[in-house]
Regions:
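Cysteine-centered catalytic environments shared across enzyme families
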Residues: 1-256
Length: 256
């Protein structure tokens, strides 16, 4: 699965640009499409507004890591892996037995977007299994990216030369598109383009970028992890208007 969004809508963490090597290898969004088509010849590319797009492929799919894609009501969702509590979630959201993992996630998003009074991380925490997914609501411009807490499903993200956000489960594509300006998407975390990156197991604590240096002292990569010593000023846990479609940044998280 792949998603590429321009800087204005993707709002990627600035720390992804820290690596000082490989900047010359960054590709344009159109270049990335050609890379995808060469590596995933059977891929389906979903063209979005302003040159943004998502893509899915069944290349190297396995029973342990199935893939599911759904497009409905201008909401695009691609998931790799499986929700172990899918039966419970189907029943909770009133979905038929045929509903796929991607359908379950979209329904959860729609219900929370329209009615929920509790934070998004609380809902992601209820998802059990080995999974990584990307969701985009074309009407609201909302992007949601999440990965299971064990990091069982491969997922990487990066930033291109023009500041576009790239997220993909294939390191070859992310690396070729972003050079050194890419990193593993942190396990147990959710990213929303309106509010940034947070841990759904430790939502009260900041997620920080940590730079890696080579033997010459140059930054060659970054990784993101929860800083259990830095507590966020406040996150409403109940009775809040915050939900998956929120666009207000949490104080203290603007630069994540």
């Amino acid at each position: 699965m792949l998603a590429v969004f321009e800087k204005a809508i993707g709002n990627p963490p600035e720390e992804l640009k820290l690596p000082s090597m490989g900047l010359e290898t960054m590709k344009s969004r159109q270049d990335i499409v050609e890379i995808v088509r060469s590596l995933w010849p059977d891929s389906t590319v979903y063209s979005l507004a302003n040159g943004n797009y998502m893509a899915s492929s069944q290349e190297n799919e396995s029973p342990s890591q199935p893939r599911s894609t759904v497009v409905t009501d201008d909401i695009f969702c691609i998931i790799t892996g499986a929700l172990e509590n899918k039966t419970v979630l189907r029943r909770h959201y009133g979905l038929p037995r045929q509903a796929t993992d991607a359908m379950v996630i979209v329904e959860a998003y729609k219900v929370l977007r329209d009615r929920a009074p509790y934070p998004s991380d609380q809902v992601i925490k209820d998802l059990e299994g080995k999974f990584a997914f990307i969701l985009f609501d074309a009407r609201s411009g909302t992007i949601i990216i999440a990965r299971d807490r064990e990091g069982c499903i491969e997922l990487h993200w990066g930033i291109t030369g023009d500041g576009s956000l790239v997220c993909c489960n294939d390191l070859n594509i992310t690396g070729e598109a972003c050079g050194k300006s890419c990193a593993p998407f942190p396990p147990g975390c959710i990213f929303m383009n309106g509010s940034g990156l947070k841990s759904f197991d430790h939502p009260l604590y900041k997620v920080r970028a940590i730079a890696r240096e080579d033997d010459n002292g140059l930054i060659c990569g970054v990784m993101f992890q929860v800083d259990l010593y830095t507590r966020l000023p406040s996150i409403p846990r109940t009775g809040s208007a915050a939900n998956w479609a929120e666009n207000a940044a949490v104080p203290g998280e603007e630069n994540i």
